[in-house]
Design a protein with these regions (language model features):
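Mid-to-C-terminal alpha-helical segments outside catalytic/metal-binding sites
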Residues: 2-10, 15-99, 128-135, 159, ...
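Generic beta-sheet signal
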Residues: 12, 19, 102, 145, ...
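N-terminal-biased segments
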Residues: 17, 29-31, 35-45, 106, ...
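Short aromatic-enriched loop/helix-cap "lid" or pocket-rim segments at secondary-structure transitions
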Residues: 21-24, 114, 211-216, 277-281, ...
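Divalent metal-dependent hydrolysis catalytic cores, especially in the metallo-beta-lactamase
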Residues: 71-80, 93-112, 139-147, 167-174
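Active-site loop-helix segments enriched in His/Asp/Glu that coordinate
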Residues: 105-134, 150-163, 179-183, 187, ...
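Catalytic pocket-lining loop regions of alpha/beta-barrel enzymes
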Residues: 140-141, 146, 152, 156-327, ...
Length: 382
């Protein structure tokens, strides 16, 4: 029996845990020496342990069986299939999911920054590496990363990623350099996604620093419970919705979905409880400002209706998903495991099952499968 059991599941969020050489075979030779490799140096002892563990599993069936039994207990690089694509196929067999979107984790730290040449070369290398990681299993859907600071490069990079087989394109949930994300210069990028029937996605970490570190300076230190890699703490959690709520609201208010009615987007690993009140806020904002702002008057639909037609969100395990569906609709929310990241927990299905126990079967099928299918293809069989 798989973890999913007899439930049909598509997973909207999983990750590869990159090794230090993840980009090496894929980056343009003239950019290879410009990667900021020190960004991965802090993980060297853990990577050595993880690689040794994977080698042991390949040589020792008992060790492999033990790892399979701890499938959702081990996290990060220590998890089964964290960086080995053959093991990842086995992990997906055990999970029983029909497919999962696969995001990068740390590779971006090697090329992010103000050096635009390095940024785009590194992004292209990461996209190629993601495609290679997923290439051996059609259930693994690679997610590209495309910065928007240079529109022409963004179009070229998105085109390459889509042609190579990326199932979605992650964009930063920030302004595009000196431009807003709806600037006409970026219409070519949004048109590329729309015409290719490929969604854009936002992901936690894509909006820059969550909050000023001074908010943590309160003489009340807390434990580094995740080991340095992904330390989202309570105050960071409060700030997570700010970036996607603003970015997606700007797309709606500026009429992007009227210009590109086939465009779809997903908001991944940023929670979704905030969406219920955000829908009302969007509609109120239009009513309050449309007299003085022509773009708001020209919208063909209520802002909340664009959300329902074009956007999807992944709740965290433990959020009151049943109530959220009741308040906002069954078409908005998607299951995600975050495998093998620790935020997904050791039993996300149990937490979602508890939150959905009074929710009807059709709405549950949309949550576990149909809405992810709709994000990826524009249609759902549920």
């Amino acid at each position: 029996m798989t973890y999913a059991g007899d439930r049909q599941i598509l997973d909207a969020d999983s990750h590869v845990m990159e090794l230090a050489d993840f980009l090496d075979e894929h980056i343009d030779p003239d950019q290879r020496d410009r990667l900021r490799r020190r960004a991965m140096d802090a993980f060297a002892p853990l990577l050595e342990t993880a690689m040794a563990g994977a080698a042991t599993r390949r040589a020792d069936t008992t060790a492999a069986t033990q790892a399979e039994e701890r499938l959702l207990e081990e996290k990060g690089w220590l998890a089964l299939g964290a960086f080995d694509p053959v093991e990842r196929t086995r992990a997906l067999d055990l999970l029983g999911f029909e497919g999962q979107l696969v995001f990068a984790t740390f590779a971006t730290t090697m090329f992010a920054g103000r050096d635009v040449d390095r940024l785009y070369a590194g992004s292209a290398a990461q996209n190629r590496a993601m495609v290679e990681f997923c290439s051996g299993d059609e259930r693994l859907y690679p997610v590209a990363f495309v910065p928007l600071v240079e529109p022409a490069r963004a179009v070229a990079l998105a085109t390459e990623a889509i042609d190579e087989g990326c199932a979605a394109v992650m964009v930063p949930s920030t302004a595009a350099g000196e431009r807003g994300p709806t600037h006409p210069d970026l219409d070519g990028f949004w048109d590329t996604l729309s015409e290719a029937n490929v969604p854009f996605v936002l992901h936690v970490g894509g909006g820059g620093r969550l909050l000023d570190p001074a908010f943590h300076n309160n003489d009340m230190p807390v434990t580094d419970h995740l080991g340095g890699g992904e330390n989202v703490r309570s105050k960071d959690y409060l700030a997570i919705p700010h970036s996607p709520a603003l970015f997606l609201g700007v797309l709606i208010y500026d009429g992007l979905f009227d210009r590109f009615p086939k465009l779809r987007g997903g908001c991944i690993e940023q929670g979704a409880g905030w969406v219920v009140s955000w829908l009302r806020q969007l509609d109120y904002g239009q009513r309050a400002f449309k007299r003085t702002e022509e773009p708001l008057r020209e919208l063909e639909l209520a802002p909340s209706e664009y959300v329902r037609r074009h956007l999807k969100f992944t709740p965290y395990p433990g959020e009151p998903v049943g109530w959220m569906i009741e308040q906002a609709g069954s078409e908005l929310f998607m299951f995600s495991s975050d495998y093998p990241h620790p935020e997904g927990g050791k039993d996300p299905l149990a937490k979602f099952k508890e939150a959905l126990w009074t929710t009807g079967g059709d709405a549950q099928r949309r949550f576990y499968h149909g809405n992810v299918s709709e994000l990826l293809s524009g249609s759902t069989t549920d």
